């Protein structure tokens, strides 16, 4: 009886040891990461669509991804400078700045898509062309919001049209302010306009569009585990082939995600923009 108990206990301990080794092996492989999303919309709205996406990607990669954003775009820029996010979804200008300043490396982007900036006005407005904006207040998300702010302002300046920029912190705030008549016009992009409140969007009209540029980047810190980045990239690229993944992509206005590399944003670098030089130099 004593021998049986000793054998049973030994086998039981071996069994426990096996599972502990397996558990610790899995824990040493699985990692936890924070993915920061540029706050073009409210944190609540972003969380509604991105938290399920990150749960899906966590399941597919075996790693753990948690959602993060910031109260406004300037705060997000400061956190990018500090390298606060392991992975970030950032606008094209942010990427060319923080690739150099904070060592973020792009690995994916929205597939078959260029980012196009817009200027919107009230649909009943008498404003018919860009010249009509001369000497008016125009709403923008932030100074360094690429397609929704930097490109429209550059075009207005090139045409000799003087405006008074008013920064309202997010794309949704721009649309809301224009739809409710607080500003005669504002800058945005197609994806966020399409995702805006349908009833209020009915009050808006697109006055003008920019040319297209390489879209937002998914970029990881260079210090992030290389295999984890590969797992994440693979899971993202496979999403459109999976019914669940396809539905999640649709929630953020994507059809698919494609692989990306640093040189994809050379079209943005060629513009030689400097809106964040002061932030970087501090």
Roles of regions detected by a PLM:
Residues 31-94:
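Extracytoplasmic small-molecule ligand-binding "clamshell" domains
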Residues 25-26:
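N-terminal signal peptide c-region/cleavage motif recognized by signal peptidases
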Residues 106-129, 217-221:
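Hydrophobic/proline-rich hinge and linker segments of small-molecule sensing/allosteric domains
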Residues 34-39, 46, 131-148:
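Short loop->beta-strand "edge-of-pocket" segments that line small-molecule binding or catalytic clefts
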Residues 74-88, 101, 131, 172-187, ...:
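Short helices/loops that flank or line small-molecule/ion binding pockets
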Residues 2-17:
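Bacterial N-terminal signal peptides that target proteins for export
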Residues 125-126, 136-227:
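Pocket-lining segment of extracytoplasmic ligand-binding domains
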Residues 33-37, 41-52, 219-282:
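An extracytoplasmic/periplasmic, membrane-proximal ligand-sensing/linker region
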């Amino acid at each position: 009886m004593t021998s049986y108990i000793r054998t049973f206990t030994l086998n039981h301990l071996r069994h426990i040891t096996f599972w502990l080794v397996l558990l610790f092996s899995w824990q040493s492989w699985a990692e936890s990461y924070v993915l920061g999303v540029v706050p073009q919309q409210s944190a609540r709205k972003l969380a509604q669509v991105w938290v399920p996406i990150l749960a899906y990607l966590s399941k597919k990669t075996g790693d753990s991804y948690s959602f993060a954003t910031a109260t406004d775009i300037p705060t997000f820029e400061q956190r990018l400078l500090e390298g606060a996010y392991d992975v970030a979804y950032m606008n094209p200008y942010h990427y060319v700045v923080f690739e150099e300043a904070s060592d973020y490396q792009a690995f994916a982007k929205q597939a078959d898509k260029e980012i196009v900036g817009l200027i919107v006005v009230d649909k009943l407005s008498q404003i018919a062309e860009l010249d009509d904006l001369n000497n008016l207040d125009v709403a923008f998300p932030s100074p360094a919001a690429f397609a929704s702010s930097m490109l429209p302002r550059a075009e207005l300046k090139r045409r000799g049209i003087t405006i008074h920029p008013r920064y309202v912190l997010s794309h949704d705030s721009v649309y809301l302010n224009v739809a409710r008549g607080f500003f005669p016009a504002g800058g945005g992009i197609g994806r966020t306009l399409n995702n805006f409140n349908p009833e209020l969007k009915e009050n808006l009209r697109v006055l003008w569009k920019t040319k297209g540029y390489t879209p937002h980047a998914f970029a990881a810190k260079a210090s992030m585990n290389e295999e984890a980045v590969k797992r994440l990239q693979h899971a993202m690229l496979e999403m459109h082939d999976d019914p669940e993944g396809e539905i999640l992509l649709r929630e953020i206005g994507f059809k698919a995600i494609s692989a990306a590399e640093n040189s994809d944003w050379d079209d943005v670098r060629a513009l030689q923009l400097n809106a964040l030089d002061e932030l970087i130099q501090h």
